[in-house]
Amino acid sequence: MEPLISPQPRFRLQPIPENPSSSSSSASITIPRSISNTSFFHEISQERLLLHHQDLEQSVQDDKEDQDSDSDETNRFLSQTRPLHRSRTAPAMVIIKDLRTKPPETKKPSPVSKSIIRQAIFLLIVYLTLGVSIYSFNRDHYSGIETHPVVDALYFCIVTMCTIGYGDIAPLTPWTKIFAVVFVLFGFGFLDILLSGVVNYVLDLQESMILTGIQTRQHHQHHHHHRFSAKDYIIDFEKGRMRIRMKVCLALCVVVLCIGVGALVLHFVEELGFVDSVYLSVMSVTTVGYGDRAFKTLQGRLFAAVWLLVSTLAVARAFLYLAEARIDRRHRKAVKLALNREITVDDLLKADTYQHGFISKSEYIVLKLKEMGKITQKDIDQVVIQFEKLDPNQIGKITLPDLLGDPL
């Protein structure tokens, strides 16, 4: 039988005896220790791991060298100063500036209101000057108790312009009657509108001053927690204006004040009784003017020239605020009903503008705004026309180049 050969090729091949006991008898043959297959593959794997680890170290070192070279090139590139050109598709700096949040500002009267005040004062002076001049040169053509020509003329002009019509001073001749007709129409139709603009300006100025004072105090106390207080009944902080009911209360207080002041003057100057003083004061403020009572003294007519002008406008403003409050209350009810009403199939079909079988959030908002009465289809059509003007390419979008006038 042939002897077994060791499978490990890197060792010198030596014969392995078949019987181990015969090793003692043969001294010329040396028998090495046999190596198993497990230890053989284990040594090979260790060598491979060692080689792989060396390769990894070499690759890491190469990467570091590449990074160093790239950083050197980048530094050399940055060291060379080059002008940066702004892309034409980048947002304009004006638009970016406008996108910054701005603190809320208190609404202030516009310069247009100031111009209306100047026009109203100028026309009022012209109106009164013309009336006083014509009355002064034609005193014999008017009936009534005379005190002073200028005072009587001013009193007559104010009573005519405010449409009170006491009847204590009235024209007698056709010429003075024609003048009275023109004077009434001109004063009632034009100057009264301008004076109402003056009242609006004064009230808006007062409102802005109140809002500014309250907002200033809140700015100093911003670290405190907001609690519901009496100021919330006066100011609508979300809309930045006084509440309607507060405006009505202020207007009514002004009316009561005018009635009280007029009654006191009538009682002490015209020497009327308490009931007659209040009666004439109310009839004058409300522009009823039965004519059974009127101002007869010089001091009373001077007072009436200023008091009637202020009080009649205050009463008109109070009635306007009352009407505004009723309309606002009606709108709130309509909004509440529109929000609580569930949408129907007909509503979905009407609101589905693009016939998709569903409505989006914007379409739902438009539907509810229509139900609330805040917008109409005419308003939507006007907005659509404006949108089409801003979208010259008719792509259904307004892009930045369209606004800047620089199409791509």
From Swiss-Prot:
Q: Where does Ca(2+) 1 bind?
A: D352, E363
The transmembrane residues are 116-136, 178-198, 249-269, 302-322
UniProt family annotation:
Belongs to the two pore domain potassium channel (TC 1.A.1.7) family.
Q: Where is the composition biased (Low complexity)?
A: 15-29
- The residues listed in the UniProt record as binding Ca(2+) 2, with positions renumbered to this chain, are D391, N393, K397, D402
* GO CC, one annotated term: plant-type vacuole membrane
InterPro entries reported in the protein's UniProt record: 2pore_dom_K_chnl, K_chnl_dom
Which locations, inside or outside the cell, does it occupy? Vacuole membrane
The Swiss-Prot or TrEMBL record annotates one GO molecular function as: metal ion binding
Bias (Acidic residues) occurs at 63-72
Q: What is this protein called?
A: Two-pore potassium channel 5
Known Pfam families for this protein?
Answer: Ion_trans_2
Query: In which tissues has expression of this protein been reported?
Result: Expressed in hydathodes and the vascular tissues of roots, stems, leaves and flowers.
Q: How does it assemble?
A: Homodimer.
In the UniProt annotation, the regions that are inserted into the membrane yet never cross to the other side are 152-171, 276-295
Specify where it is mainly localized. Answer: membrane
Q: Which domain of life is it from?
A: Eukaryota
What organism is recorded for this protein? Answer: Arabidopsis thaliana
Query: Region (Disordered): which ranges?
Result: 1-29, 58-82
Record topology, Stromal segments: 22-115, 199-248, 323-408
Which segments constitute the EF-hand domain? 339-374, 378-408
Q: What is the lineage of its organism?
A: Eukaryota, Viridiplantae, Streptophyta, Embryophyta, Tracheophyta
